[in-house]
């Protein structure tokens, strides 16, 4: 898959397929030490069907396909949950629930992002299906992850920090706890 006509010529993709390494179907569930390794191109790939959804709409404020930069990568790396918002370390800060793109990613990477790593559509959303509204990796409308699924009626998405106090995973990059 890549650039060119798809679905028998009904659509034309202008962005090539992303570079990523996936897990074996028989390897168990995703974890912080065993996960899809997103390397590059996810936002452009999503844009084949969804356009530059967040980049060209004034009602949506989250960029994608751009470098995190030093400030956001530092917040990501330090954030270790609501109960420990600055106790993380870069070497073990990867959170499978909030992935990022980096050419150095592997399926067993545990390191958090560098300033040059990219935020992508898949940092907050899953492709085409989740139990959360808006194909979110979590329910964006709740304050506490313990409320996930209650308001929307969706399947409760597990809290990666296992804390009754854990706030939205937006805090992994935007720490407002």
Regions found by a protein language model. Give the residues of each.
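A motif-centric signal for short, conserved binding hotspots located
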Residues: 1-177
